[in-house]
Amino acid sequence: MTKTRCMHEHFRKIVQRVKKTLRLSASDKSHGVAELDDLPEECVSIIVSFTSPQDACVLASVSKTFASAVKSDIVWEKFIPPEYESLISQSRAFKFLSKKELYFALCDKSVLIDDGKKSLWIEKANAKRCIMISAMNLAIAWGNSPQSWRWIPDPQARFETVAELLEVCLFEIRGRINSRVISPKTRYSAYIVYKKLNICYGFENVAVEVVVGVVGQDLEESCRRYICFDETMDEQFRRRDRGKNLVKPERRKDGWMEIKIGEFFNEGGLLNDDEIEMVALEAKQRHWKRGLIIQGIEIRPTNIR
């Protein structure tokens, strides 16, 4: 079955459910796309809004009925964040856009929220929210000590300032986010986004313990893992007992490095008010560490780059 026929079949089932809800006959004509022509365009738009942005774009290329309905704000208002009006107020570029244009603008460019302490954008295919928590919004051990860390601007960063590690023995970073800020019923991955300076030491073959979980809940040992900021770690180090769970960093398209610190499932919903905490800690190797620049912690749906 071709993708187009699959989409027709998918929508045939949706239309039948909608017609039943609207007390319309579900037995007239064929059971294909043709029966959509019997429905008002607004109703077709509502139907499309219960799918995904990717499906909506495919359907727009399938038939004129879909193409017209997909242009409606009814469709795209369902895909953009509920607080889109406050997002618009923070950016002049968004002010005069249609809902569809706003959706794709938020896919292509992140917008600062929470007084510039977080960055929000949406994933183009499924409208899932992605968030980066800035270093300013993280709890960094000795972060207020000018001998240990300093806060500097970086033209390649999304935020006004980033955190440069000058020198510490205890390396600890903690970040929190409310589950309501991200998409419900979604598995997320969390990443530390950073750069290494030319003079960087103290992280060679050093395993940093990381954990991601819900605040107030006991974390299972399986939630814990180890990362290494040094991408040139040697094989002997990797073969150690905990080396099998050791995560290496990867280079991003924007020039920064990222390293995965864990995953979690966001149940979400109006009654769910969990705080998700992400921790990176290295306190066992009591030697000086220097030369990282931390932009923040990025949270995005698992398997999305």
UniProtKB/Swiss-Prot annotation:
CDD domains: F-box_AtSKIP3-like. SMART domains: FBOX (SM00256). Gene3D superfamilies: 1.20.1280.50. It comes from the Eukaryota. GO terms for molecular function: carbohydrate binding. PANTHER family: F-BOX DOMAIN-CONTAINING PROTEIN (PTHR32278), F-BOX PROTEIN PP2-B10-RELATED (PTHR32278:SF119). This is Putative F-box protein PP2-B8. The gene is PP2B8.
